[in-house]
Amino acid sequence: MRDELFTEELKKQFEFDERVAGVFDDMLSRSIPYYALALELSADFALANLPKEGGWVYDLGCSTGSLLLEIERRAGAKNPRLIGIDNSEAMLSRARAKALGYGSRVDFIQGDILDFEYQKSEVILCHYTLQFIRPIHRAYLVQKLYDSLKPEGILIFSEKVVSEDRVLDHQMIERYYAYKREQGYSEVEIVKKREALENVLIPYTAKENEKMLLEAGFAHVETLFRWVNFATFIAKKGEA
């Protein structure tokens, strides 16, 4: 279904409810530059860091489940345990419907990623999710994810990022709005979504994200991909 959510007046704070879930796949593809490529890279590196057989993969803020279903499709004999976690039942109902259609064994669980008890895993994925976690809790979550990874495990996540330079940041935002116009969003929709996400989506700079990861204990942090103010990072835990 096409995303026309912000052509109407929203009567409450933005949340991932039934209305958003119904258009979410279209919203992602038209609102996040190279979103499909970020997922493809995530699947590539997730599979490369799994053992020959088995292993655990979590996707936090899994929304409609597309990434885990793609990893499962490509995993073959590796046959990892794939678990998606989201706090939105509306999103998960769509993920489960997709899984049923594909005959998938991916587990989709409703829960709070801050409180969830994770099994030791090789891979944790977290795309455009940390930016919705309040800064006061964000470092705690990253530390918890680090502690949940096995030695040499990886965390792959994507975030909207801000520039340390005010002028450059403004230019980057304007280029992003131009992208949204190219995708068919109107000026009214762009303004309404910006207002809806204010104080809900709180991005860090790339350096702030890297600092948070290193302070949690990750041995290596790399930028896998970046387009203007959207970035995909990979962080690797050291050996035991």
From Swiss-Prot:
UniProt catalytic activity: prephenate + S-adenosyl-L-methionine = carboxy-S-adenosyl-L-methionine + 3-phenylpyruvate + H2O
Cystine crosslinks: none
Superkingdom as given in the UniProt entry: Bacteria
A Pfam family it matches: Methyltransf_25
One GO-annotated biological process of the protein: tRNA wobble uridine modification
InterPro entries: CmoA (IPR005271), Methyltransf_25 (IPR041698), SAM-dependent_MTases_sf (IPR029063)
Family: Belongs to the class I-like SAM-binding methyltransferase superfamily. Cx-SAM synthase family.
Name of this protein: Carboxy-S-adenosyl-L-methionine synthase
